[in-house]
């Protein structure tokens, strides 16, 4: 066993979605604990604040994004970073059976605040180590959680592993606008206006911090081209990005192979 010097900085993951945001945490271990606590603390108010942020249009957008990603009735779905279930709720509608949809998230508080159907399965877990067998799902979604994982390569390899051959991937994320004016506008909206509005929703101070953190992680996130390259490196095919109104990125991909050709294997522990 190698003894690590206590003063040695913790290495940054090889394909981290962004540099450490030291205004909030110092190390990768700190980041995971910080995010879990912040999401747990803000779970009760999350949906109401999100509805304000999106002006009530979020459900319709998520519904259409999943359709563009290829989600159809009868598909077996995994929603990674399920949170309070905003994306999973639309997946339940589109599949026609909530029992076909599984959600996984590292924040038990967020999942406890969800209003999802009782027949949908919710499990605690992380994108980098999914507790499911190989070749298990027809469709994998993730809504606005790409910035919160530790290593894109590790997580994307897990996504590819649990998808069946021919299975589809749809990752939704907010991307920093290229236009300087729109970037300034979105920054001030998320770092200033939304944190101010949270005071009318809740006395929980972490709500304001959460939305400022969201913008800072968006601003620091790796460019879409790097996300696409990392997805392709896992062996996923038909990798592409669809962009809505200049900020909503939809990363889509398909697992190689013909549907029905995969063999379900033992899950990782």
Where do the model's predicted regions map?
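Conserved alpha-helix/loop element of class I SAM-dependent methyltransferases that forms part
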Residues: 55-73, 90
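A short acidic, Gly/Pro-enriched loop at the edge of an enzyme's catalytic core
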Residues: 128-139
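C-terminal alpha-helical "lid/dimerization" subdomain adjacent to the S-adenosyl-L-methionine
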Residues: 30-34, 176-230
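Core SAM-dependent methyltransferase catalytic element
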Residues: 236-269
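Class I SAM-dependent methyltransferase SAM/SAH-binding core
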Residues: 78-129
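A short glycine-rich, Lys/Arg-flanked "PGG" loop and its adjoining helix->strand segment in the class I
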Residues: 153-165
């Amino acid at each position: 066993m190698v003894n690590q010097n206590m003063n040695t900085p913790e290495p940054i993951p090889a394909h981290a979605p962004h540099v450490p945001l030291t205004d909030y945490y110092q190390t990768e271990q700190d980041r995971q604990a910080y995010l879990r606590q912040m999401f747990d603390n803000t779970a009760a108010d999350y949906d109401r604040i999100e509805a304000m942020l999106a002006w009530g249009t979020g459900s319709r957008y998520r519904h259409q994004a999943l359709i563009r990603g290829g989600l159809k009735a009868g598909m077996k779905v995994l929603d990674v970073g399920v949170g309070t279930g905003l994306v999973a709720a639309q997946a339940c509608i589109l599949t026609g059976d909530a029992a076909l949809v599984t959600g996984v998230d590292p924040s038990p508080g967020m999942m406890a605040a969800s209003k999802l159907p009782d027949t949908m399965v919710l499990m605690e877990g992380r994108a980098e180590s999914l507790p499911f067998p190989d070749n298990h799902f027809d469709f994998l979604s993730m809504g606005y959680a790409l910035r919160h994982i530790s290593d894109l390569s590790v997580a994307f390899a897990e996504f590819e592993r649990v998808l069946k051959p021919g299975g589809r991937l749809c990752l939704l994320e907010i991307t920093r606008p290229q236009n300087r004016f729109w970037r300034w506008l979105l920054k001030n909206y998320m770092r200033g206006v939304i944190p101010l509005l949270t005071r009318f929703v809740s006395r929980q101070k972490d709500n304001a911090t959460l939305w400022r953190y969201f913008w800072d992680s968006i601003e620091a996130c790796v460019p879409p081209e790097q996300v696409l390259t990392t997805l392709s490196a896992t062996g996923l095919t038909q990798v592409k990005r669809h962009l809505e109104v200049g900020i909503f990125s939809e990363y889509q991909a398909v697992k190689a192979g013909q549907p029905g050709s995969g063999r379900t294997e033992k899950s990782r522990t």
